[in-house]
Amino acid sequence: MNKSRYVFFILACLFGLYVQAQNRTVKGRVLSAEDKEPLIGATVKIPGTSIGVVTDIDGNFSLEVPDKDKTLVIEFLGMSTLTAKIPANGVLNVSLHPDTQRLDEVVVTGYGNFSKSSFTGSANTLRGDLLKNVPVVSVEQKLQGMTPGVSISGNSGQPGANQSIRIRGMGSFNASKEPLFVIDGVPVTSGSLSGGSADAAYMNNSKTNIMSTLNPSDIENITVIKDAAAASLYGSRAANGVILITTKKGTKGRAKATLKMDGGFSNAAVEFRPTLNGEQRRELIYEGLMNFQQDEIAKNPEAGLASPTEYADLHINDYASIPELGYTDWRKELMRTAHHQSYEASVSGGNDKTTFYSSLGFNRQEGLVENSNLDRYAARLNVTQKVGSRGEVGANVMFSQLNQEMNEERGSSINPFLCVALNTTPSFSVRDAEGNYVGSYPSSNVNPLRDIRTDYNRTRMTRMFSTGYASIDIIKGLKLKETLSYDYNIQKDSRYWNPLSGAGAKSGSDAQTAKGFIEYSKLISSTSLGYNTTIAQLHHVDALVAYEIENYQTDKAMGDKSKLPSDYLVEPDNAASLNSFVSSTQDSRMISYVSRINYDYDDRYYIAGSFRRDGSSRLSPENRWGNFWSVSGMWNVGAEKFMQSIKSVLSDLKIRASYGVNGNQPGALYGYMGLYSYGQNYMGGGGSYESALPNPNLKWEKNYNLNLGLDLAFINRIFVSLEYYNRDTKDLLYNRPISSTTGFQNYLGNLGQLNNRGWELELRTINFAGNNFNWTSVLNMTHNKNKIVSLDGKLDQSIEGSWFIHKVWLPYSTFYVKEYAGVDPQTGKALYYMNTQDANGNYDRTVTTDASAAQAIPYKSVDPKISGGFTNIVNYKWFDLALTLTYSLGGYSFDKTGTYNETDGAKEQNYNLPIYELDRWQKPGDVTDVPRFVLGQAAGPQNSSRYVHSTDHLRVKNLTLGFTLPDQWLTKLGVSKARLYFSGSNLLTWAKWDQYDPEVPVSGEVFCETPPMRTYSFGIEVSF
């Protein structure tokens, strides 16, 4: 017996030695390819087995591997899985790249996070690292072309100017059309602080974008919610979709410090409204004078008038003189190469109990014109702390300050800068012979260069946004959470006009000064109870109930004065004459009850529902409460057994559907009340007047949203998402016209119905995936059709302004113009289609030179037929490339500026003219669309389709090229990562109409806006 044991012991030892001889130890380290930081908890395993280890806090691992195994599989959440060959020396160091598809799988809704595979609604998530190097100030601009269904329009190219965002079309007449912004689960203020200071048209009329206060480098990801499945949770604020921003948090592990610096320059993205030079304009004016005299002689052949040549020689210097100092190139004088610079630092880290992320940043962006600048100072601190085994507290604090200088724009300004700059002729000199600024010109009464150097329009916006929360796990799966947030903004505006500028001239050639502020605060309290459980490993339930209170307050005031004793004493207190002073204080409140429940069976069948009840102080007690809800479901067909046989080809298939109701409350805080305004002078004393009619029947505007979705994946490399949506907006908030005998033109009420329907396509392909080379492409495409379904039941159309119409069954933004038919080749006169209608509604297509006889008709729309973007992301060893193209087809714009300087001689005596006047008609037989130029002739119609132009375009929107220095270069420096990069925006543009930028304001009306910038940026990012 003892002998048997002895033999067995010897055999066991020999077998152990044999096994040991067949194994080897593989050691190594797993890092992130992005920042060269260690990946803690990455799995390193032998293929086809469960044998493996996880990396430690430094990313290191050690694994016993049989000799027969030649490779290892390395996996980490959010990273591409890597299969690596084991080196002969047994040391395997690898870097994992982000997996775009997997990183986008988490959908953050603000009322819970869901994996993309289980989300029943319509949402797109973008990683912050894809956006951080895009060289623009505002977060919204970074989204352009990155997700289907989202349209972003710049109202101005000046730094920090407000942006307009539409998600799946325009869904309201008078209520807000902008989406709700949510930062770290809390709704925040976005857009502009309405009306600048106290609604003065000339105070900050380009409007500072509040979202420019946010440092994009602090963003972890952005989720865009487009349907009712998740948006209904936000009720009355989510009628136009939701944009959820999640900021960066600290992670467990050693502290990481990152420094980032970049700088560069910008110019106009397109050759903005090219005009004639001095000689070209003089030649055109001379021709126009001759044509005028020819027409006069033809009318009065016996009058003995001077010949056309004599007449033109006599008057040419009245309109196109040759300056003593030479012609002025106003673009060269006024426009500049703008420069920008940015400095950012962040530190993050944590342990088992505490995590933190902190950052500081400074950005300076110059505009294309002097006195157009933006400085941003931003700081952030995000902290989480575990309390015991079940509790957690946290705080997110942001502080930011914007210092902005802007030039006046558009027609609402007293002195819109670009209108003046474009219209001032080369015959006008900037300075006289003594070097002094010329005071004014016949075209505008101002010298634009002098004005931008002596006038100013300054805004300082300070924002503090803080959120604190505390949560506790009452029992397993049941969590109670309390969140309190405070969003505070104060904007201070100051203006000064020299005595000869627009406002100064209007006050009697006296300098004018103005000052104002608007203070805005929002306090939100949210208490929620959530429950999450799994039953029998098949049934998953996730439910939540919440109670929220939102309190909103504004305080604003503005005054302007004139008669200053000196141009150096510009404080309003130094001025003798008070021109105006306005002020207001407003507040509103909303109380909400929120609930949702999600259920799925075996990760195959999903159903979800939500209900929210909002009570708003902006509506009467009878209509104060609104109910908003959604139901949604999904069938994960790819998880069914009958699909497994084709899984290698059709790797995923999901069918989604949702339906629900969102709401929109009035923008006016007291829209249902009758209002009186006081402070009026009545017989030497105080007085008042009725300023708004009451409407106790005012109620919620509601959106009814249907969404159908289909998700497909082929061979785990081609991913297709196709969605159809239908959005009906009913009880539209609208200023209803009433009889002028009431003393009012309109009052706020509910009427009509608006519809948006369309489809979205997103195609994502993994073109190549390997150890050294990865290439991913994403194409997105959107088609949206907007139409008015009904107005008030009595009228089927309403003429809006000079060239828009709201008509049933047509898009909201439809032009209403006389249809231009080109130029008569024999006479050079402009032609128009008659477009009178017979009893059957057919249009008479006869052409006429009498514009007054032609009828205006609905003509084309602002809305494009197709729009989208195409992004490519390439990684090769130490190089990375990201390229985004944007495109738009089928949309149109109206050139209001053309109604001033494209009138064929009617208004151009003292204006400059567009370059396409070189293509004008000059002799019989000329075929062109630019009529004969006759100086001083009667003006044609302003509401002409001649000024309607296509916005079709393709643009290289963003390009980033980076080089990450190899590890062996950095080891001795104590640096974990160093990356050099170039980034650019709006680098190339191909447009069907190239006289101004094709990315026009959301209204479709183009008039004296600063064009967007083409930006080149060079930077370095270093991590320690």
Where are these regions (language model features)?
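Short, small/polar-rich motifs associated with maturation and membrane association
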Residues: 2-11, 15-380, 392-394, 398, ...
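Membrane-spanning beta-strand positions in outer-membrane beta-barrel proteins
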Residues: 71, 151, 220, 254-258, ...
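Surface-exposed loop/interface segments of Gram-negative outer-membrane beta-barrel transport/assembly proteins
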Residues: 177-178, 183, 189, 194, ...
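Residue-level signature of outer-membrane beta-barrel architecture
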Residues: 247-249, 349-351, 362, 385-386, ...
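Transmembrane beta-strand segments that form the barrel wall of outer-membrane beta-barrel proteins
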Residues: 261, 360-366, 607-616, 767
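Hydrophobic, well-ordered secondary-structure elements that form the walls
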Residues: 631, 657, 722, 761, ...
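Outer-membrane beta-barrel "beta-signal"
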Residues: 631-634, 760-763, 963, 1012-1024
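Glycine-rich, aromatic-lined ligand/substrate-binding cores of catalytic
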Residues: 862-895
